[in-house]
């Protein structure tokens, strides 16, 4: 896999992630990107990123009395919050590759964790989940290298989405399809999020600052629905004889 590195004083980042459309901070141009002396470079993209961090704050508050009982959800919360915070700083300032890493690395790790978790729930042995997920994530990096720019990034998100949604039918069936709305609604939100991410620059005639901010908003809604489903699953394990009705 071809992978050239660009150096900065802070960190080395491979070109394979970004393609030819990046600017000085290593990230791509968006419809809203206008490098000026303004304090906030991309206000819509920056403030909408808070929608990603919001579910992390909500569920941290929700499990505050018994956090250790919800160990997996608790482990996911920092990555979700860092993703939202990193996206806010990245889009707002466009000055640091550290913020760029915070924009996508927590999401990458979080997607991997949840995908392995769902496959481990669906398959007889937990290690089978790791075996099922590994080639998918190798494919994700491969497609970013094959398709430059935003197209490759969007394709990688699509692959990740399919990977962690695939085992959910077995999990839904196990719990009599309770909370199906979370999975259906979350899937629709993630599909819409990727769609709006893809058409960001094509939609400027309708929305002058593009549609990337809708990627953040629908991702935040989808993250909330998914976190709520993780909360539900854990409650089923804690109270197997008194399963909650969706």
Summary of predicted features, one role per range:
Residues 5, 9-246:
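Multi-pass alpha-helical transmembrane bundles in non-GPCR membrane proteins
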